[in-house]
C-alpha cells in the first residue's frame, strides 16, 4: 500500500485529509488477510506518534480496527514516543498528545518505546558508536520476537496474547507498558561473561535496559510479565523472581492492591540474532528474558510531553496548520 503524498508531520493531515483517502483500501486489505487466518488472536500495530502518518493515520486505523473487530480481537500497539533530547519535528508534542487520546480508547495494550533510550542501549551495551535505525529496529525486534515466541514455539509455560493482556492491564485505560530486554551484550563481551538466569533477571529491572526514558524506581509496579526464552528450567526462573522480591524490594515495589505482581512465561526456543551485515554487534545467547511492566513511572513520559505541549499551545503556536486540515480548535487541541 502506498500513497502519493506524506502527512507533513501533521496529525490532522494524516487523520483527516490524506488518511481518509487510504483508510478504505487499507481496511479492505486487512479484512482479506484476516479471512485467511485460521485462529486470529489479534493485531500488532507498529508506528511512531511524533510524525503525521504514525500519529494521524495510525489513530484512524486503530479506530477502524476497533469498529470492525470490537473487543473480540486484541490490539497490541508498539508506539515510538518522542525522546527528551532527540527531536525530529517541532510539532511532535501536538501529534503525540492527539495520538495518545486515540491509543487510550482504541488499543488493548500499548508498548512504549523511545529512540533515545534504545540509542543509549546500543552505545553502552553493544559498543556501537553511531547506531543506525537498523540497529535500533533489531533491538526492538528481540522484544517482539520474545512476545510472540509462545505463539510460534512449544514451551513449559507458554503465554498467548490474551494471557499477556489479562496479566498486564489492571484497568482498561491503564494499558501503557514499558519494555526491557536482557542480555544485550556484544560478541566480544559474551565470550568471557557467564549469563545466568539471576543475572539477566536483575538486568531487565535496570534503568539502563528499559526502552523508554524514565526512572522506574520512582514509580510503583502494578503488574510485571517476565518472558524467558531458551535453556531455562522453571525452578530457576521462580528462584530469580523470588530474589527480586527479597533483594530489590526497595526499588521494585508493587502497589498494595497487587501483591503477587509477577507473571512468568518460559519458552524453549533459543533467542536468535541477525549477525553481521550492518555492523550489528549483538551476541547470540543461550537464554534471554523480556520484561513487560505496567508501572506508574510511565507518567514521567506523559508529563514531559504535556509540558512541551502546554508551552506551545498557550501561545497557539502552529495551531493554524491543524485547523487548516479540517480540525476544530476545540477538538483535542
From Swiss-Prot:
Localization in the cell: Cytoplasm, Cytoskeleton
Cofactors required: Mg(2+)
Record field: catalytic activity: GTP + H2O = GDP + phosphate + H(+)
PTM entry text: Undergoes a tyrosination/detyrosination cycle, the cyclic removal and re-addition of a C-terminal tyrosine residue by the enzymes tubulin tyrosine carboxypeptidase (TTCP) and tubulin tyrosine ligase (TTL), respectively.
Record's keyword terms, sorted: Cytoplasm, Cytoskeleton, GTP-binding, Hydrolase, Microtubule, Nucleotide-binding
Main localisation: cytoplasm
Record GO biological process: microtubule-based process
EC numbers on record: 3.6.5.-
SUPFAM superfamilies, alphabetized: Tubulin C-terminal domain-like, Tubulin nucleotide-binding domain-like
Family: Belongs to the tubulin family.
Function: Tubulin is the major constituent of microtubules, a cylinder consisting of laterally associated linear protofilaments composed of alpha- and beta-tubulin heterodimers. Microtubules grow by the addition of GTP-tubulin dimers to the microtubule end, where a stabilizing cap forms. Below the cap, tubulin dimers are in GDP-bound state, owing to GTPase activity of alpha-tubulin.
Subunit structure and binding partners: Dimer of alpha and beta chains. A typical microtubule is a hollow water-filled tube with an outer diameter of 25 nm and an inner diameter of 15 nM. Alpha-beta heterodimers associate head-to-tail to form protofilaments running lengthwise along the microtubule wall with the beta-tubulin subunit facing the microtubule plus end conferring a structural polarity. Microtubules usually have 13 protofilaments but different protofilament numbers can be found in some organisms and specialized cells.
Cited PANTHER family: TUBULIN
Entry protein name: Tubulin alpha chain
Highest classification ranks of the organism: Eukaryota, Amoebozoa, Evosea, Eumycetozoa, Dictyostelia
